[in-house]
């Protein structure tokens, strides 16, 4: 009778046992197999899929950035190889700015299921400021190497119409001249000329710390150059001159001088100081202050070690160097995979800073061409020989300035091409590393599916009644 009942229950349920006491061995094995199957399902259907989706979202953004770089190259080529008329310059520049905005706003700020994919551990914080803010002040530490400088040509001087000038030679004497300087662009413009006001900081608007190996002693040596007010350690070896780019002597740099243009975020060094940096192959950090941020500016803590001060809440926050903020997923037993790529490792801030520089060179060409047009109108409206001679001298001087500034502008477009190649290489490396991790996750996923099937077969063999 018991056997008949047992077989009847097995036939109805198609299971070998109905309760653990029917066969403890089968019951224990079933528990282990079900636990294994549940874990495999968690890995395959949740962990690995989430990891692959995160990486796929990142890869899509990086791929879109690469495509936008390719599109930008054609416009940069136009500016580098052709003399563009004013309307064409405006069109090219506007297009470049739109691409840069799209790269950061649409791609670098992307998220997966509400988590920002390029912001390291701070997945709940956007890469960019969502709105203008004047309540935050940052002291930012940005690292560079000795080869980070650009050799650029700057135009100084230049003639302007002056109704009191009657001698054309006076305009000739004011003709613009070109100078070469070594330029370092910081990640931000519109920086502060004032010190970071919080206690424990270095008491100045900018300080540069050079580190190199002393050729005599073989020891690592640090030299600091700073603007007025510096009270850090070690003591400053030299001074940094602070100016605005609108100062008449903004780009006049002595051979051994360092000049900081706070409004454009530029550091300029003279040729002797530059040669010294190159000889020593000095790595260096620049610590500077920025007070106000516009909507879609990059949050400094996503790229740099920095200190933030919230003036509304009177709160100071120290942010460590954001390197190596790795987010890991467990995708199999004792097998983890890093799913995230940080913006600082893939998307260079040089992109928008270079377009800022191009914009400035275009602006200067536009301004001098406007001056020439105004002089042409004055020439056409007078028959006075002396005045014509004076105006023609002014025009000649302005045309010289236009030619000089046009060369600087085309060089800037050419530098943009080089920058895009370098930034594109950075994206390419990040994409390749991401692709390798994605392929590993895909192999793990396929293996998990096989193990799931095998686990199902073993579970069925252990639990199910064979009706054949």
Residue ranges and their predicted role:
Residues 1-130, 389, 396-468:
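Amphipathic alpha-helical polymerization modules
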Residues 2-10, 15, 198-201, 207-225, ...:
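The ATP-binding site of the protein kinase catalytic domain
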Residues 4, 8-11, 15, 120, ...:
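Polar, low-complexity export/assembly segments characteristic of proteins
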Residues 28, 49, 211, 221-222, ...:
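Intrinsic low-complexity, intrinsically disordered segments enriched in polar/basic residues
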Residues 74-221, 268-270, 294-353:
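Amphipathic alpha-helical coiled-coil/heptad-repeat segments
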Residues 163-165, 227-252, 310-317, 389-406:
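Surface-exposed intrinsically disordered loops and tails
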Residues 215-286:
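Signature of Asx- and small-polar-rich beta-strand/turn repeats characteristic
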């Amino acid at each position: 009778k018991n056997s008949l009942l047992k077989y009847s229950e097995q036939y109805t349920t198609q299971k070998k046992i109905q309760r653990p006491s029917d066969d403890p061995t089968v019951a224990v094995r079933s528990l282990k197999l079900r636990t294994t199957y549940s874990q495999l399902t968690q890995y395959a259907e949740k962990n690995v899929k989430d990891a692959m989706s995160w990486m796929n979202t990142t890869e899509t953004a990086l791929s879109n950035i690469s495509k936008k770089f390719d599109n930008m190259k054609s416009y940069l080529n136009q500016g580098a190889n052709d003399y563009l008329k004013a309307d064409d310059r405006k069109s090219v520049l506007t297009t470049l700015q739109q691409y840069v905005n799209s790269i950061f706003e649409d791609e670098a700020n992307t998220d997966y299921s509400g988590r920002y994919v390029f912001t390291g551990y701070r997945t709940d914080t956007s890469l960019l400021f969502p709105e203008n803010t004047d309540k935050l002040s940052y002291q930012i530490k940005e690292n560079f190497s000795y080869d980070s400088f650009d050799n650029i040509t700057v135009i100084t001087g230049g003639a302007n119409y002056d109704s009191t000038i009657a001698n054309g030679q006076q305009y000739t004497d004011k003709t613009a001249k070109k100078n070469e300087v070594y330029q370092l662009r910081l990640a931000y413009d519109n920086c502060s000329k004032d010190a970071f006001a919080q206690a424990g900081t270095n008491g100045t608007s900018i300080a540069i710390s050079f580190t190199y190996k002393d050729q005599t002693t073989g020891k690592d040596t640090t030299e600091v150059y700073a603007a007025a007010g510096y009270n850090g350690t070690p003591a400053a070896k030299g001074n940094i001159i602070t100016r605005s780019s609108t100062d008449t002597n903004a780009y006049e740099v002595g051979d051994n001088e360092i000049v900081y243009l706070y409004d454009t975020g530029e550091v300029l060094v003279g040729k002797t100081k530059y040669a010294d940096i190159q000889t020593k192959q000095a790595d260096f950090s620049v610590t500077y202050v920025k007070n106000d941020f516009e909507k879609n500016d990059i949050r400094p803590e996503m790229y740099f070690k920095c200190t933030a001060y919230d003036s509304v809440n009177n709160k100071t926050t120290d942010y460590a160097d954001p390197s190596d903020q790795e987010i890991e997923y467990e995708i199999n037993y004792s097998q983890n995979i890093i799913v995230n790529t940080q913006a600082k490792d893939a998307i260079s801030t040089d992109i928008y800073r270079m377009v800022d520089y191009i914009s400035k060179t275009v602006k200067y060409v536009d301004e001098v061409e406007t001056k020439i047009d105004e002089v042409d109108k004055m020439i056409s409206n007078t028959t006075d020989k002396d005045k014509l001679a004076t105006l023609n001298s002014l025009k000649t001087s302005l045309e010289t300035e236009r030619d000089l500034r046009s060369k600087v502008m085309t060089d800037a477009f050419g530098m943009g091409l080089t920058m895009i190649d370098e930034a594109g290489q950075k994206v390419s490396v990040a994409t390749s590393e991401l692709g390798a991790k994605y392929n590993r996750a895909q192999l793990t996923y396929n293996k998990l599916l096989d193990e799931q099937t095998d686990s199902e077969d073993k579970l069925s063999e252990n639990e199910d009644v064979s009706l054949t």
